[in-house]
Amino acid sequence: MAEISILGAGGLTGKELLLLFSRQKEHEVVHITSDKLAGKTISEVFPEVSFPKNLVFKKHEDIVPLKSLVVLAVPNEVSVESAPKFLDAGHKVIDLSGVYRLHNQEILEKYYKLKHTRFNYINRAVFGIPEIFRDQLKNADFVSNPGCFSTSVILPIFLLGQLRKNLRPRIIVDSKSGVSGAGGRTEDSGYSYTSVYENFRAYKILSHQHEPEIREYVYSKSGLSDPEVIFTPHLLPVYRGILSTIVLEFDSEPEQDLISILENSSLNEPFIRILKTPEEVELKKVQHTNFLDISLRKRENTLVVVSALDNLVKGAAGQALQNINLMTGAKETLGLLP
C-alpha cells in the first residue's frame, strides 16, 4: 500500500483524484491540501466522495508528507518550487502541471509565461504516458503527467508503429474540449459553462501550451525531423471530454491495413480501444473512464485519425493513478477498472 498526499485536492483534477482513490483499497490518501478550503472536511466540500477517514483540507505549507507519494495538482508556478522540495526530501512525486514536460527552457517559459528557476530537475522527470514509457515509470521517482490534449494526439500517432517513419513532418490537429479541460474553474474567465452554453469557439490559436509538448514527444518517439504542429483547440458547451481530429500525410500511400496496425499495437493495453470507423468515436463512450478511443480513415497518402478521452480521467487524474500504480508496483488498472 502507498500513502498519498494530494496538494491542490480542492480543484477539478484534485476532486477527480479523490473520487478515484475512494474506489480502491490499496492506496491510502493521508493528506489533502487547498489554501482556499483549509479547515473543511472532504464530506463538506465533496459529499459524493466517501473515505473511511473524513480528511481535513490543510494549507500547502502546513503538511509534512512523511513517507507518502506526493501528487501536485497545483498551479504551474507552485509546482516549479514544490516538486524539487519534495524530491529532495525523498518523496516520489507526480506533477500534473506542465512545467516539467518540456526540455527547451526558452520554449517552456514562453508558453507557460513564467521564469523556471528549477530547470535542472527537468531531466529527472519521466513523461507519464504509460503505454509509451511503462518501463521507465516503474522505476521513476518523478513523473510529469502529460497534458490532456497531448495525450489524445501523441498516443494515437505512437500506435502507428513503424509507419511513423514515413510521415511527413507536418501535423494538423483540431481538438474540441469541454470547459473542465480549458480552465473552467474561474467564473469570469470565459471558460465557464455559462459562457459557452449555446456557443462554440476556438481559443489559444497557435499559442496553446500543449502544442510544443506534442511536437517534442512526437519527434522523440517518431523520428520526424522537428515536425510542424498546427494545433487549434476549441471549447465545447459540455463539461468533460476531448475529441481530437489529427491530419497526417505519408510520403507514399501505405498498403497495410491501418486499423489492424492499431489493434496489434494496443493488443495488451487495457485502456486503449480501437474502433472500426472514426464516426464511432464520441465523447459519451469515454466520459468518466480512463479509456482512449481511436479510429482512422485513409485516402491515398492522407490519414485522418480521430481520438477521444475524458480530460479529467485519462487526460489527468486517471493517468496519474495509472502512473502511481506503476511506480508503486500495484496492478496498473487498480481503481480504474471494475
Swiss-Prot record:
Q: What class of enzyme is it?
A: oxidoreductase
Enzyme Commission numbers on file: 1.2.1.38
Localisation per UniProt entry: Cytoplasm
Q: Give the record's GO CC terms.
A: cytoplasm
| Active site residues of this protein | C148
Q: What's one GO MF term for it?
A: NADP+ binding
Q: What is this protein called?
A: N-acetyl-gamma-glutamyl-phosphate reductase
Where does the source fall among the domains of life?
Bacteria
**Primary localization:** cytoplasm
Keywords on record? Amino-acid biosynthesis, Arginine biosynthesis, Cytoplasm, NADP, Oxidoreductase
Enumerate the PROSITE patterns for this protein: ARGC
Q: Which reaction does this enzyme catalyse, per its entry?
A: N-acetyl-L-glutamate 5-semialdehyde + phosphate + NADP(+) = N-acetyl-L-glutamyl 5-phosphate + NADPH + H(+)
- Pathway as given in its UniProt record: Amino-acid biosynthesis; L-arginine biosynthesis; N(2)-acetyl-L-ornithine from L-glutamate: step 3/4
